[in-house]
Amino acid sequence: MISKPDKNKLRQKRHTRVRGKISGTSETPRLNVFRSNTNIYAQVIDDVTGTTLASASSLKLTGTKTEQAAEVGKLVAEAAKAKGVEEVVFDRGGYLYHGRVAALATAAREAGLKF
């Protein structure tokens, strides 16, 4: 019998492969995205020191999932700018740049983050 591939394991492999190529510094931290079935989370991470500079999630937001993702992008951009971060490296977390991930990225760009 043919077994279906585990989507999350494939995503984790993609994420690990990409993480070998990108890294956040104190000047340009990494904007990491995690997407669950119900919520979306975003963090601005300085990989040199291993600290999270800003974060936002859709845990308390309402609306459609795409609208929530756009709001999270706006919130994380505002939090990052409050910490003095203007430019980031976008880490899509192994997800396709489509739908909620793209909505978050677009909203973060519109809120003033450069990537």
UniProtKB/Swiss-Prot annotation:
A Pfam family annotated for this UniProt entry: Ribosomal_L18p
One of the protein's GO biological processes: translation
Bias-annotated ranges (Basic residues): 10-20
Protein name: Large ribosomal subunit protein uL18
Gene3D superfamilies: 3.30.420.100
Family listed: Belongs to the universal ribosomal protein uL18 family.
InterPro entries the record matches: Ribosomal_uL18_bac-type, Ribosomal_uL18_bac/euk
Region Disordered, residue ranges: 1-29
Keyword annotations: Ribonucleoprotein, Ribosomal protein, RNA-binding, rRNA-binding
Role noted for this protein: This is one of the proteins that bind and probably mediate the attachment of the 5S RNA into the large ribosomal subunit, where it forms part of the central protuberance.
Domain of life: Bacteria
Self-association state and partner proteins as the record states: Part of the 50S ribosomal subunit; part of the 5S rRNA/L5/L18/L25 subcomplex. Contacts the 5S and 23S rRNAs.
Species of the source: Lactococcus lactis subsp. lactis (strain IL1403) (Streptococcus lactis)
GO MF term list: 5S rRNA binding; structural constituent of ribosome
